[in-house]
Swiss-Prot record:
This is Synaptonemal complex central element protein 2. Meiotic cells (at protein level). Expressed in the ovary and testis. The keyword Coiled coil applies. Keywords: Cell cycle, Cell division, Chromosome, Coiled coil, Meiosis, Nucleus. It comes from Mus musculus. Homodimer. Found in a complex with SYCP1 and SYCE1. Interacts with SYCP1 and SYCE1. Interacts with SYCE3. Interacts with TEX12. It is found in: Nucleus; Chromosome. Residues 1-52 are annotated as: Disordered. One of its GO terms (biological process) is synaptonemal complex assembly. Major component of the transverse central element of synaptonemal complexes (SCS), formed between homologous chromosomes during meiotic prophase. Requires SYCP1 in order to be incorporated into the central element. May have a role in the synaptonemal complex assembly, stabilization and recombination. Residues 52-83, 118-146 form a coiled coil. The lineage of its organism: Eukaryota, Metazoa, Chordata, Craniata, Vertebrata. Residues 24-36 have a biased composition (Basic and acidic residues).
Length: 171
């Protein structure tokens, strides 16, 4: 995963010069290093003792404080990054453990359901075998009844000796 805005490289202000304070357009000539003959560089007045020396010390103090703040920010970012890395690792371990437990539980449930299904399939197979057996017995009974019925029908069509004699005597 990418880190966004974490642990940026420290910014060094020691080698950088503070931006010049520009009060008017006249001072811009000194920024371009275009000095006209007879003109005095405005930076020369900053080197004079007096109120400008306190400005130089204030600027140095501000630079130091800014550098300290940047270092503190970078340290905080590094600590945050370490904290997030530890949190991520801990979370991964917990998720992994929970996943393993869930998987084990799923397999236990699958095993239990498989046993139940196997028992029911065995019962079903036994009942189907019994139904097939009863069906065969019923077919045999039907065939026997049919045979008996046919025999009875054939016997009723064939006159017995007495019936034949009776019929012969009528004529």
């Amino acid at each position: 995963m990418e880190r966004h805005g974490v642990a940026a490289p420290p910014v060094e202000l020691k080698d950088q010069e503070p931006p010049a304070i520009v009060e008017s357009g006249e001072h811009r000539q000194s920024e371009n290093h275009e000095e006209t003959p007879g003109s005095v560089a405005p930076s020369a007045s900053c080197q004079l003792p007096g109120p400008f020396s306190s400005l130089d010390s204030s600027i140095e103090t501000l630079k130091k404080k800014a550098q300290e703040l940047i270092e503190n920010i970078n340290e905080s970012r590094q600590k945050d990054h370490a904290l997030m890395t530890n949190f991520r690792d801990s979370l991964k371990m917990k998720v992994s453990d929970l996943t393993e437990k869930l998987e084990e539980r799923m397999y236990q449930v699958y095993s239990h359901h498989s046993k139940i299904i196997q028992e029911r399939l065995q019962e079903f197979t036994q009942k189907m075998a019994k139904i097939n057996h009863l069906e065969m017995e019923l077919k045999q009974v039907c065939q026997t009844v049919e045979t008996v019925y046919k025999d009875l029908c054939v016997q009723s069509e064939v006159p017995t000796c007495e019936e034949q004699n009776y019929k012969d005597g009528e004529c």
